[in-house]
């Protein structure tokens, strides 16, 4: 039997959800939030309903650092079907063009070369990017096409996995803002046959290991059979969301000053500048600060627990 709903609680950390297929990221976010009975929750970059895989969910104070995960690199495995283009560039859309598939593995591997490194990508109309305050997908559903500017992205790795015509499987390591559906659609055009996504799984966000993910079904089972506090054991610490930033350990005096929101002058022997993750003298994560060029610690996003 499901636990009766109670007043929300202050719970803090990052939950690595293995998102199920067929649900929007926001819908599954709300379900996870209810299971944890959390006052505050947010995800770190939406996955399409068709997609599965890693969706870090920030609870409580972790929401202050969700942008760092949104801006981080992602890794995906995608299966594309060659020969058909759809209006959404995935299997959930309507087929708009069908062409013969006359390409082999060698041609595909050659075509992949032009998609590696720093490239420009025109976002799909079926995206949450906004034009005049309205998401592009709302225009698309009305049959309206809005002119979009190409955006710079980086494909760090584009690995050929398998080709069993007409299905092609790839692994992609990419920067923020990359649309895998658009990548597949563009590849289909280069190959001359068209293509769309049939399977998409996010394997990694930042440095989070795939082994740390938990399915919603398993989380739900835990919530029904274990005390609420047992769920908290599956939350990762707040500072994991900003693990890519340099670490700065403070003295007791500096910790006290930063706790009052004060800027602190310090001897920057390591010459660290820009954003850092701050830890107190007793190794407690305090938040994120900016180190200025005149060696001042300027608190920006601080934990309040």
UniProtKB/Swiss-Prot annotation:
List UniProt keywords, sorted A-Z: Isomerase, tRNA processing
Gene3D superfamilies, A to Z: Pseudouridine synthase, PUA domain
EC number(s) for this protein?
Answer: 5.4.99.25
**Any Pfam family:** TruB_C_2
- Write down the CDD domains for this protein, in alphabetical order: PseudoU_synth_EcTruB, PUA_TruB_bacterial
Per the entry, what this protein does is: Responsible for synthesis of pseudouridine from uracil-55 in the psi GC loop of transfer RNAs.
Family classification: Belongs to the pseudouridine synthase TruB family. Type 1 subfamily.
Q: What protein name applies here?
A: tRNA pseudouridine synthase B
Q: What is the organism of origin for this protein? A: Actinobacillus pleuropneumoniae serotype 5b (strain L20)
């Amino acid at each position: 039997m499901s636990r009766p709903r109670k007043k929300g609680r202050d719970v803090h950390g990052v939950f690595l959800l293995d998102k199920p297929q067929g649900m929007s990221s926001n819908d599954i976010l709300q379900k996870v939030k209810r299971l944890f009975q959390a006052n505050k929750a947010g995800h770190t970059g939406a996955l399409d309903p068709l997609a599965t895989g890693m969706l870090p969910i920030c609870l409580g104070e972790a929401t202050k650092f969700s942008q760092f995960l949104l801006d981080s690199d992602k890794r995906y495995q995608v299966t594309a079907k060659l020969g058909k283009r759809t209006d959404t560039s995935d299997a959930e859309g309507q087929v708009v063009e069908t062409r013969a598939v006359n390409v082999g593995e060698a041609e595909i591997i050659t075509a992949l070369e032009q998609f590696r490194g720093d490239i420009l990508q025109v976002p799909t109309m079926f995206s949450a990017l906004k034009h005049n305050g309205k998401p592009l997908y709302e225009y698309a559903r009305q049959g309206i096409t809005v002119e979009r500017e190409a955006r710079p992205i980086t494909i760090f790795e584009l690995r050929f996995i398998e080709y069993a015509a007409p299905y092609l499987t790839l692994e992609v390591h990419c920067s923020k803002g990359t649309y895998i559906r658009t990548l597949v659609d563009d590849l289909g055009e280069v190959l001359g046959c068209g293509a769309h996504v049939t399977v998409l799984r996010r394997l990694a966000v930042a440095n989070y290991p795939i082994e740390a993910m938990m399915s919603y079904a398993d989380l739900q089972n835990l919530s029904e059979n274990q005390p609420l506090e047992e769920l908290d054991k599956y939350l990762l610490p707040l500072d994991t969301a900003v693990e890519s930033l340099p670490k700065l350990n403070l003295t007791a005096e500096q910790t006290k000053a930063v706790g009052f929101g004060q800027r602190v002058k310090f001897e920057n022997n390591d010459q660290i500048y820009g954003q850092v993750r701050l830890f107190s003298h007793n190794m407690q994560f305090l938040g994120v600060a900016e180190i200025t060029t005149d060696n001042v610690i300027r608190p920006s996003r601080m934990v309040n627990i």
